[in-house]
C-alpha cells in the first residue's frame, strides 16, 4: 500500500475566528488527505491538551504556530515511509514521540490533525469514501441529527443555564427528510421568537440565543415551534439537552436557576423535565467528576432517557471503562479532539457499543468546513450526530456530507430514527 511521503501543516481560522491547525498528508502514489482540527468552548478538565502559543501579540495568545511546527519538524519526518493504512501504528508512533499522558508535548491539535489527514489520504488511495474505508461494508446507518436550535449557558449570554436545547427528528423515514424537518422547525422557531419580541441572534453553533426567564421557557418555545411547523412533539420530533453542568458547578453545589442545588436536587429537577417533555437525551447533567451523582441519575432516569457523558468521559477509553463499571451514564459523546487521535476515538466507540452504551458523534463549538465527523458517524453506525443548527456553513457542511453519503448508499442506507433511542418509550 502507498506510504507517507510528505506531511505539511498550517494555521487556519475556525468558525469563531480563532486559529486552529490544518494538516495535509501526501502519499507516494499521489493521494492526498486534508483535515482541520476543531476546538471547544466548554472543555472538560480531562481532555487532551490543545497546544496554543500563548503569545499575547498574536491572536490574543491563541495562535497555534507551535502545534504547526510540531507537525512539520517532528511528526512529519517521523512518519515518512509509514504505510498509510496502518492507522494504529501511525497514531502510536505519534504517542511515543509525544511521550506524555495528555499529548501536552506535541499537542492534541497537532496529533489529531495528522491522524485524520492520514485516514483521508489512505481512503483516497483505496478509492473509497472515508465512511466506507473506516467502517467497511457494514457502514450504512445514517444518524439522527441532534440540532442545537436554542442556546444558553456558555454558548450564549442569557438567563438560561442549560447550554443546548436540541431537536431530534426521530419519526423521519430518511436522513434527508429528518434534515428538512429540522430546518423547518428552526425557521418556524425564528418566527415564534420574532412574534414574541425576542432576540433572533445566534450562538456559536447556529442556534438562537434569546434572553429567556427559564430553561422551561426554552423548552416551551421549541414545543410551540414544532407544532407550528406541523409536526407532533415526541412522535415525530423529540427534544434533547446538553446541560454542561460542570460550567455552573461551584464548591460542591450547582448554581442553577438562581438556587444552589445538590446533585440529588438536580436529579429531581431532571425527573420533572422528563415527565413533562418528550426528552430522549440529557448530556452532562452533572459535574464531570461527580461519579456518585452520575450513578444516582443513571439509576433513576436511565431506563427512560439517554444519559450522555461528555465532560465525564472526554472520549477517553479509560474514563469510559470506569463509567461502564460503576453504572454512570448509558451513552458516550464522541469528540475526536477530546482524546486527540482517530485510533483512540474508534477504541472508545467500540468499548461503548460492546457494553450497550449508545454513541453520539459530535462537533465542537469552534468548527471548520472539515466534514470528517459525518463520515465517522456512518463508519461506526452510531445512529446520532450533534453538529449544531441547520444554519452556518461550519455546521451545515456536516449535514450536507451526510446527504451525499445517503445518496452513495442508495437503497442500502438506513436512517436510525427512533431506534437510536430505545429507552424513549412514548410521546408526551
From Swiss-Prot:
- Necessary cofactors: Mg(2+)
Q: Which InterPro entries match?
A: Enolase, Enolase-like_C_sf, Enolase-like_N, Enolase_C, Enolase_CS, Enolase_N
GO CC annotation terms, alphabetical? cell surface; extracellular region; phosphopyruvate hydratase complex
Cysteine disulfide partners in this protein: none
Catalytic activity as recorded in UniProt? (2R)-2-phosphoglycerate = phosphoenolpyruvate + H2O
What does the note accompanying the cofactor annotation read?
A: Binds a second Mg(2+) ion via substrate during catalysis.
Q: Where does (2R)-2-phosphoglycerate bind?
A: 163, 335, 364-365, 386
Q: What is its EC number?
A: 4.2.1.11
- Keywords per UniProt: Cytoplasm, Glycolysis, Lyase, Magnesium, Metal-binding, Secreted
Please list the GO biological process terms of this entry.
glycolytic process
Which compartment or compartments is the protein found in? Cytoplasm; Secreted; Cell surface
User: Which SMART domains is this protein grouped with?
Assistant: Enolase_C, Enolase_N
Q: From the Swiss-Prot or TrEMBL record, what is one GO molecular function term?
A: magnesium ion binding
Q: Which residues bind Mg(2+)?
A: 242, 283, 310
Q: Which pathway does it take part in?
A: Carbohydrate degradation; glycolysis; pyruvate from D-glyceraldehyde 3-phosphate: step 4/5
* Organism domain of life: Bacteria
Q: What is annotated as the active site?
A: 205 (proton donor), 335 (proton acceptor)
What does the similarity note say?
Belongs to the enolase family.
Q: What does this protein do?
A: Catalyzes the reversible conversion of 2-phosphoglycerate (2-PG) into phosphoenolpyruvate (PEP). It is essential for the degradation of carbohydrates via glycolysis.
Name of the protein in question? Enolase
Amino acid at each position: 500500500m502507498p506510504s507517507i511521503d510528505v506531511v505539511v501543516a498550517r494555521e487556519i481560522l475556525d468558525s469563531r475566528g480563532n486559529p486552529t491547525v490544518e494538516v495535509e498528508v501526501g502519499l507516494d502514489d499521489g493521494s492526498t488527505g486534508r483535515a482541520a482540527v476543531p476546538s471547544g468552548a466548554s472543555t472538560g478538565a480531562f481532555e487532551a491538551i490543545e497546544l496554543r502559543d500563548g503569545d499575547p501579540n498574536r491572536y490574543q495568545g491563541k495562535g497555534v504556530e507551535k502545534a504547526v511546527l510540531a507537525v512539520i519538524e517532528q511528526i512529519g519526518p517521523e512518519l515518512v515511509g509509514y504505510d498509510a493504512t496502518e492507522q494504529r501504528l501511525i497514531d502510536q508512533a505519534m504517542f511515543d514521540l509525544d511521550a506524555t499522558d495528555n499529548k501536552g508535548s506535541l499537542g492534541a491539535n497537532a496529533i489529531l490533525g495528522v491522524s485524520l489527514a492520514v485516514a483521508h489520504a489512505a481512503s483516497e488511495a483505496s478509492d473509497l469514501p472515508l465512511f466506507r474505508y473506516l467502517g467497511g461494508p457494514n457502514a450504512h446507518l445514517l444518524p439522527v441529527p441532534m440540532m442545537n436550535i436554542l442556546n444558553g449557558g456558555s454558548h450564549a449570554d442569557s438567563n438560561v443555564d442549560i447550554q443546548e436545547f436540541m431537536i431530534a427528528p426521530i419519526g423521519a423515514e430518511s436522513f434527508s427528510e429528518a434534515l428538512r424537518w429540522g430546518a423547518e422547525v428552526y425557521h418556524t422557531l425564528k418566527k415564534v421568537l420574532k412574534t414574541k419580541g425576542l432576540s433572533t441572534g445566534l450562538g456559536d453553533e447556529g442556534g438562537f440565543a434569546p434572553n429567556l426567564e427559564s430553561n422551561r421557557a426554552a423548552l416551551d418555545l421549541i414545543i410551540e415551534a414544532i407544532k407550528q411547523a406541523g409536526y407532533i412533539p415526541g412522535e415525530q420530533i423529540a427534544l434533547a439537552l446538553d446541560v454542561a453542568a460542570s460550567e455552573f458547578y461551584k464548591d460542591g453545589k450547582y448554581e442553577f436557576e438562581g438556587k444552589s442545588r445538590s446533585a440529588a436536587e438536580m436529579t429531581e429537577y431532571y425527573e420533572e423535565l422528563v415527565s413533562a417533555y418528550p426528552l430522549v437525551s440529557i448530556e452532562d447533567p452533572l459535574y464531570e467528576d461527580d461519579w456518585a451523582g452520575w450513578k444516582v441519575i443513571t439509576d433513576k432516569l436511565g431506563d427512560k432517557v439517554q444519559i450522555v457523558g461528555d465532560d465525564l468521559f472526554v472520549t477517553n477509553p479509560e474514563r469510559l471503562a470506569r463509567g461502564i463499571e460503576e453504572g454512570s451514564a448509558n451513552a458516550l459523546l464522541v469528540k475526536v479532539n477530546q482524546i486527540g487521535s482517530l485510533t483512540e476515538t474508534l477504541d472508545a466507540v467500540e468499548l461503548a457499543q460492546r457494553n450497550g452504551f449508545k454513541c453520539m458523534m459530535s462537533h465542537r463549538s469552534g468548527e471548520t468546513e472539515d466534514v470528517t465527523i459525518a463520515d465517522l458517524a456512518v463508519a461506526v453506525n452510531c445512529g446520532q450526530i450533534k453538529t449544531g443548527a441547520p444554519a452556518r456553513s461550519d455546521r451545515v457542511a456536516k449535514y450536507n456530507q451526510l446527504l451525499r453519503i445517503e445518496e452513495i448508499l442508495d437503497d442500502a442506507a438506513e436512517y436510525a430514527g427512533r431506534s437510536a433511542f430505545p429507552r424513549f418509550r412514548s410521546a408526551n
